[in-house]
């Protein structure tokens, strides 16, 4: 049976490892003023030279977390401006940097969609639980909604070296077919700037 999802939706917070309560609090980081390119809500990000950039450009990049929104003082109006995503390039007033809000709990669980069937059988799919995957083949987002359309790249599985570790099916009733594309999965960071490389 096909899943209802027909596209990716990035990474959506969904509890924490160990089934402990998740505060889903956000930490403040900076995006360098006038940085070109978009960074979407639900996109994995990392820190380079002190600034937030995408972590979806390399299968072995170590994310700091997932972008949830930004804040800056608009250059033309000088008004405080909150946004769902970074619509690059943004140059704030007074030569300031853009503040970004990132879910950086390395034990945060996320729901994401697969780009393909996890396996041809349910038993085969279960055998891939706790393997690691990247998301580099299917990134981007909507410049209308600002939402990421990243999916988990099922073709790049490895026991230890990829960014995201598949924990289980998210048991989303309309997107629970592991033998079809766009099933909803639960993942956790395998590579992290905070807790090591996962190897």
Describe the residue ranges of each PLM region:
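Surface-exposed, low-hydrophobicity beta-strand/loop segments enriched in small/polar/acidic residues
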Residues: 1-199
């Amino acid at each position: 049976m096909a899943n209802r999802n027909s596209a990716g939706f990035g990474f959506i917070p969904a509890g924490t490892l160990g089934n402990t309560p998740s505060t889903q609090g956000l930490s403040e980081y900076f995006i360098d003023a006038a940085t070109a390119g978009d960074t979407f809500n639900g996109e994995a990000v990392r820190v380079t030279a002190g600034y937030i950039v995408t972590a979806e450009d390399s299968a072995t990049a170590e994310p700091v977390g997932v972008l949830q929104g930004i804040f800056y003082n608009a250059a033309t109006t000088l008004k405080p401006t909150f946004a769902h995503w970074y619509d690059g390039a943004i140059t704030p007033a007074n030569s300031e940097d853009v503040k970004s809000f990132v879910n950086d709990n390395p034990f945060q669980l996320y729901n994401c969609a697969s780009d393909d069937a996890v396996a041809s059988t349910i038993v085969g799919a279960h055998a891939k639980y706790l393997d690691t995957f990247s998301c580099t083949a299917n990134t981007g987002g909507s410049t209308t909604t600002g939402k990421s359309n990243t999916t988990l790249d099922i073709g790049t599985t490895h026991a230890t070296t990829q960014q995201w570790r598949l924990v289980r099916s998210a048991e989303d009733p309309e997107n629970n077919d592991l033998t079809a594309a766009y099933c909803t999965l639960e993942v956790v960071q395998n590579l992290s700037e905070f807790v090591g490389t996962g190897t």
